[in-house]
Structure formats: C-alpha cells, structure tokens
C-alpha cells in the first residue's frame, strides 16, 4: 500500500528551496533557478518497509504569493519545510511568520487530527562568515513551535539534505500512525456510548 506525502516549502528564497529539492532528488547542486513559477516534484521511495509517493510543492516567489495565507495547504500538506538563509535576517523573519501561521490555534475549517510535521532549515551554512542569524535563534524558534531544526549547506552537503528529508518523512509516518490509532478508539467509545444508552432503555422496558 502506498502513502502520499505532501510537503510545502517556504514561499521566500525560492532558489534556496529548489536547490534543496534538486539535491534530494538528484544529488546535484544547481545555484540559480527561475523563481517565477511554482513546481510540484514527485519521488517514489521505500522507507521502513513502506512504499511511499512523495510530492513536494515548491511555490513561486511572486509578491502576491508571499502573503502566507496557507489555508489550502493546511488542508492537504502532511509536512512543511520552512527554509531561511542564515546570511539574510529578513528570510528568518519570514520563516518565523510562516511557522506562527502553521501553529496558530486551529480553526474549525482546517482542523486536523494531529499537528503537521514542520522542519525549520537554516541553509547556506557555508556562508558562516557573513552569518546574520545565529544557530541558537533557529533552535529556539523550532523548540518553541514543536519543529525539528537543522542547519546545512545545499551547495556542499548532499547527505545532510537527504537526512533532513528522511527525518521529516519519518515524522509524517508517525503522524499517520497516530491518526490510525485515534480512529478506532473513537469508534469504540461511540459504540460503548450507544450500547450504554440502548442497554439502559432495554432494562427499563
């Protein structure tokens, strides 16, 4: 049985996120990407004896796309990879706003059984000499908002990029298991409630 896993990327610094995606899919690094169109990448993989179909949605960087409403994505995305550039503080501020939006108290129209998996990634670790965002800041933001966190360099660290994706996919699989566990327990509780109500009626008759 195959599972579909959907990941949503940060809507800013699109060349950075596309670099991570291409690293994961092909193990190659390409520095420049067109950022005026959105992309959906698909990959089939086997993990923990499960056949998985992974879909990665990478949005365009047009200003109108950067309002991070995320309403539709909160419905279908199983996980979010929020990427910022450690040498650009404004990208970190935008990543923070996106995480706050994802972790807002859930409204009725986008209520989920479990929280979405979120991975905060500080990219361009190879540019530490011009760093504007400290490692501690990223770690603190992740801990406060129940996210995983790492710093890496898409340009230099193919293995680290792959491991980051594997970690969030594992988080998503754990969430799938939690959903499955909650469904039967809810059914059992309802069956017990119905049995109690009708059982009492039978006794009274």
From Swiss-Prot:
Keyword Hydrolase: yes
Gene3D superfamilies referenced in this protein's UniProt entry, alphabetically: P-loop containing nucleotide triphosphate hydrolases (3.40.50.300)
PROSITE patterns in the cross-refs: RAS
UniProt xrefs under Pfam families: Ras
Binding site for GTP: 11-18, 58-64, 123-126
EC id: 3.6.5.2
SMART domains for this protein: RAB, RAS
Top EC class, one word: hydrolase
Keywords, in A-Z order: GTP-binding, Hydrolase, Nucleotide-binding
Region of interest called Small GTPase-like, as start-end residue ranges on this chain: 1-205
GO molecular-function term, one example from the UniProt record: G protein activity
Catalytic activity: GTP + H2O = GDP + phosphate + H(+)
Alphabetized InterPro entries for the sequence: P-loop_NTPase, Ras-related_GTPase, Small_GTPase
Function: Binds GDP/GTP and may possess intrinsic GTPase activity.
Family assignment from sequence similarity: Belongs to the small GTPase superfamily. Ras family.
Record PANTHER family: RAS-LIKE FAMILY MEMBER 11
Protein name per its UniProtKB record: Ras-related and estrogen-regulated growth inhibitor-like protein
Gene designation: RERGL
